[in-house]
Amino acid sequence: MQANFKPLIVWLILDGQAEKALNLLAKNYKVSTPKLKVGLPKGHKAKAFGCYTPKGSTISLLNSDIMKNPFVILHEFYHHLRTTVDKKHKGTEKNADKFAIEFIEAYKAESRKGSQVSQGV
């Protein structure tokens, strides 16, 4: 994983390029790229910003504004990653949060240094 990978992923999401970020994540972790769609599946609470559906490998988002939310995109990608690797989707909320926060913290650290994160694109 290149040094600026995590900050780059967050930057892409903030820049409205969530699909490109998901492609890079999938390539890096050697898994398929999940589909991304706006609109939660029936039965999901409107208070959830996103959810991952293993059947169909789809990340569903509450609305289009969430497309630029790195925490939600990365959190749901973690569920895709776990489901792809070990077929488990239970008890992973804390780890999904941790995964997302790790990327966001790396982005913040690069931003504090004044680095041009987007140069990796």
Residue ranges and their predicted role:
Residues 2-59, 64-66, 113-121:
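Auxiliary, metal-adjacent structural segments of Zn-dependent hydrolase domains
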Residues 52, 78-80, 99:
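Aromatic side chains
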Residues 9, 81-85:
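Short amphipathic alpha-helical interaction patches enriched in hydrophobic/aromatic residues
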